[in-house]
């Protein structure tokens, strides 16, 4: 099995005050299938806008929770995200893998923010956590490469009391 999510451009806006917004979400492969490959490459997640007053909506650029043999998330850009979220539920996660990938995880050459727009801008005081690249759940025998990623443009216009973890 090969699942390929390549060369997409995604623009999203959400004006409600709860829930979550995810640009690309891969899920459902369980139990682990060591011969499966998931490829998420060369995508642009652009301008996810969560604008409900006092929103607690989470923003995620790319998310994988499937248990494949190989996971490649390479050369993607997540940029121009904005939020009015003031609570911890309004977290920003650029790229996350929570799938129990068996053999290889490659999360390389991605940009969270670039010269055109930063990764995330909060327009209110917030305690929403910021996670750049978050990877967990793989077995100790899995080879992991998280290299040459660029994280920039994390803006808190009115201040922040949040944790920030970039990789």
Model-identified regions with their sequence ranges:
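Surface-exposed loop/turn motifs in large extracellular/passenger domains
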Residues: 1-17, 24-52, 58-85, 91-120, ...
């Amino acid at each position: 099995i090969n699942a390929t999510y390549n060369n997409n451009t995604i623009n999203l806006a959400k004006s409600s005050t709860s829930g979550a917004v995810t640009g690309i979400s891969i899920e459902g492969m369980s139990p682990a299938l060591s011969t499966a490959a998931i490829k998420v490459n060369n995508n642009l997640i652009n301008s996810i806008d969560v604008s409900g007053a006092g929103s607690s909506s989470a923003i995620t650029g790319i998310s994988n929770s499937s248990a494949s043999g190989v996971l490649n998330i390479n050369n993607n850009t997540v940029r121009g995200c904005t939020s009015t979220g003031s609570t911890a539920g309004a977290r920003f996660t650029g790229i996350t893998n929570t799938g129990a990938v068996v053999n290889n995880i490659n999360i390389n050459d991605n940009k969270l923010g670039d010269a055109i727009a930063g990764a995330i801008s909060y327009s209110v005081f917030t305690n929403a956590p910021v996670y750049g690249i978050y990877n967990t759940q793989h077995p100790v025998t899995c080879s992991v490469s998280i290299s040459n990623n660029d994280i920039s443009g994390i803006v808190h216009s009115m201040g922040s009391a949040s944790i920030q973890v970039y990789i």
